[in-house]
Amino acid sequence: MSCPLRKKALPLTMLLLLLSFHVLITPVSKANKETNRSVHFIPTVEFAVNTFNQESQDEYAYRMEHIMSSWREKVNFPTVYSMRLQLRRTICKKFEESLDICPFQESHGLNNTFTCLFTVGTYPWITKFKLFRSVCS
């Protein structure tokens, strides 16, 4: 004697098993894609801040205080990122070492903080960058 519920339960069980397997796999692949993107994004941000410091007339260096927003532009070549960064003046001179850990100046004067929009192309396989746009206020 066969049980009709058992015949229906087996396909449903298989479906649940397949769906749960899909849910487990999907976040891992998305996480890998995001990790690959961030591997190229961080050096691109550093390039933008270094370019800002080189072109600035200020004797003090600025470093990033906050990434306000960022996105990858929809172009195939090169990889292009746009980012809105908040830069703040440090107590270190421009060409000192370890600017990435240099403390910020304490005063919050008008010239101590900039909000900048950078658009930068990156060629990660040859470690080359190109600044397409830089607007600061």
Swiss-Prot record:
Q: Which gene holds the coding sequence for this protein? A: Cst9
Name of the protein in its database record: Cystatin-9
Family membership: Belongs to the cystatin family.
Q: Which GO terms describe its cellular component?
A: extracellular region
Which GO molecular function, any one, fits this protein according to its record?
Answer: cysteine-type endopeptidase inhibitor activity
> Keyword Plastid, does the record have it?
no
Give the coiled coil ranges. Answer: none
Q: Which residues form the signal peptide?
A: 1-31
> Which GO biological process entries does UniProt record here?
antimicrobial humoral response
The free-text function statement in the UniProt record for this protein reads: May be involved in testis development. May play a role in hematopoietic differentiation or inflammation. Has immunomodulatory and antimicrobial functions against Francisella tularensis, a Gram-negative bacteria.
UniProt entry tagged with the keyword Kinase = no
Instruction: Spell out the disulfide connections.
Output: 92-102, 116-136
Task: Report, from the record, the phenotype seen after gene disruption.
Answer: No visible phenotype; probably due to redundancy with other family members.
Q: Which residues are glycosylated?
A: 36, 111
- Its predominant location is secreted
Summarize tissue expression: Expression is restricted to fetal gonads and adult testis.
Q: Which UniProt keywords apply?
A: Antimicrobial, Disulfide bond, Glycoprotein, Protease inhibitor, Secreted, Signal, Thiol protease inhibitor
